[in-house]
């Protein structure tokens, strides 16, 4: 009995010794409350974004289309560069099961179906389950791969750290420079335009600091 009373007294003292919550009238509390609601809304939209696009995957390949209107095919510079990596990033925060299963499987499928020249991906048609273009056009492949690395795979790697998506980026970079077609006095370049070479500069510099591979600054200085 005495032990029970002593326990009750300790509980009462503990409860009343807890600092009081600032309450709804505190500016800091109100700001924190607004921040919490805004964060919740943002995360809810991200969650619906992931599942919304997954609902429109090609039922055969499991890849996502370029858009939901006229482009029922996968491509590197849109489907891959601007959409899929951010589904992965959002799922890493909001749906770990989806991140570990479906979204990882999509990468393996992408590599298996869309690699056209070594690790360089090309447009993949869902209606035929074949490449959209009958012939390899190197500038298209290098542009798509460069956009995918800079816009999608690099931000994903900077958030998650080294993953299989990092391996995908390194593989594409290797193939870009293996097949670089533009002759210059300092050696081959991937392209003669500022967009592709700009993509390359942004990716090469960051890859060097991640890996220490001396080829990356050498290629960047060549550009």
Annotate the PLM regions.
Residues 1-9:
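Bacterial N-terminal signal peptides that target proteins for export
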Residues 8-17:
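Bacterial N-terminal signal peptides
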Residues 22-223:
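Glycan-recognition and catalytic cores of secretory/periplasmic carbohydrate-active enzymes
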């Amino acid at each position: 009995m005495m032990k029970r009373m002593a326990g009750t007294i300790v509980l009462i003292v503990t409860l009343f010794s807890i600092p009081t919550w600032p309450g709804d009238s505190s500016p800091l509390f109100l700001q924190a409350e607004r921040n919490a609601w805004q964060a919740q809304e943002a995360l809810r939209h991200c969650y619906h974004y992931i599942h919304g696009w997954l609902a429109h995957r090609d039922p055969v390949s499991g890849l996502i289309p370029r858009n939901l209107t006229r482009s029922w095919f996968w491509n590197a510079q849109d489907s891959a560069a601007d959409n899929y990596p951010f589904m992965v990033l959002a799922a890493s925060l909001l749906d770990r099961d989806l991140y570990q299963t479906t979204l990882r499987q999509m990468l393996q499928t992408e590599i298996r179906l869309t690699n056209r020249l070594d690790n360089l991906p090309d447009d993949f048609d869902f209606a035929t389950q074949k490449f959209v273009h009958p012939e390899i056009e190197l500038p298209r492949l290098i542009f798509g791969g460069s956009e995918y690395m800079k816009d999608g795979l690099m931000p994903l790697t900077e958030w998650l750290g080294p993953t299989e998506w990092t391996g995908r980026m390194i593989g594409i970079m290797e193939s870009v420079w293996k097949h670089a077609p533009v002759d210059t006095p300092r050696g081959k370049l991937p392209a003669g335009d500022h967009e592709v070479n700009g993509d390359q500069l942004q990716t090469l510099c960051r890859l060097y600091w991640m890996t220490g591979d001396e080829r990356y600054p050498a290629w960047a200085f060549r550009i």
